[in-house]
């Protein structure tokens, strides 16, 4: 009897990690974020925006796009690619939160946010923790260690694309990873709080927009709305 072949393209009805609890919550959050965006995006159309709002229009939209890209990679089983994108998502979340807590730093953004002028990701995380008076024993560089390893192909990134090969041990996947639910759960567990902050930053930078009637805990997976923010 021939083994059952996996579909070339997965759909929401047969994706490999369908039913994972954290993935379900990721989908709920996407629904809520897209609804919030459908209310927030029009507020950036045809209005004079502050420097902070222009920055937010760009970075929030990019963050949501990356989160949706990660979700599709999970659906198709490309978990390693999703983990690579995670750092880019976290960086945008951190920029939004950092400039919200340190509005005086917007000049660095306006100058191009160049390396050497803008703070590093780990330094922004440390500054955020200090501003919020969080006595965390973990420094920003330690929080980013695994993400940096995956991004820059360091030796300790090896476990993130290992797959079992039966009697032949394990190997490094070059394509879909369909039998590592732990990797799926880990990715979702990191994306969810990051996307929550990005959604909160919509309200922070555009406070006059009413909250969506559908909250995260009540969101129906799959409901969304298009609506790109536009800079002026």
Language-model regions: role of each:
Residues 1-21, 55-77:
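Short, charged N-terminal helix-start/capping segments
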Residues 56, 82, 86, 140-144:
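Short runs of predominantly hydrophobic/aromatic residues within well-ordered alpha helices
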Residues 52, 75-82, 105, 136:
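Residue-level recognition of alpha-helical structural elements
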Residues 85-87, 103-112:
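"Short basic amphipathic alpha-helical interaction patches in structured regions
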Residues 32-73, 114:
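Short, contiguous, well-structured surface segments enriched in hydrophobic/aromatic residues
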Residues 1-47, 108-232:
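Long, charged low-complexity segments
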Residues 60-101:
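Short, hydrophobic, well-ordered secondary-structure elements
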